[in-house]
Amino acid sequence: MSDIPPDLHYTAEHEWVRRSGDDTVRVGITDFAQSALGDVVFVQLPEVGAQLTAGESFGEVESTKSVSDLYAPVSGTVTAVNTDLEGSPQLVNSDPYGAGWLLDVQVSDAAALESAITALLDAEAYRGTLTE
């Protein structure tokens, strides 16, 4: 079974969200997603400062098997991207919840972030999507 940390929030598109500040989150793909993708060879991410809209594509992950779109779990501004993935995209496979993170997003304010996180899946609900 895939590793699903209980302290994170999830999307049906197999991304995770970790609150990292009052109005910021860190985003990555789940263990299930990296396992399904196979060996990741390239990650395309937006520039710092880019505006994301929840539910819309913001980049892609390319593996030896396929290319998959990444979808924004929340709306906001990209404040950081994981530049380590440029030279080491395999970090998405080896440490999807740590060194393989994708980007940080700042939401307009703490209330907006609270609302956005509430709309995401908790670990148990995400686990349920994997067994359907």
Swiss-Prot record:
It comes from the Bacteria. The keyword Phosphoprotein does not apply. Keywords: Lipoyl. GO terms for cellular component: cytosol; glycine cleavage complex. Residues 24-106 form the Lipoyl-binding domain. GO terms for biological process: glycine decarboxylation via glycine cleavage system. Binds 1 lipoyl cofactor covalently. The glycine cleavage system is composed of four proteins: P, T, L and H. Belongs to the GcvH family. The glycine cleavage system catalyzes the degradation of glycine. The H protein shuttles the methylamine group of glycine from the P protein to the T protein. This is Glycine cleavage system H protein. The lineage of its organism: Bacteria, Bacillati, Actinomycetota, Actinomycetes, Mycobacteriales. The gene is gcvH.
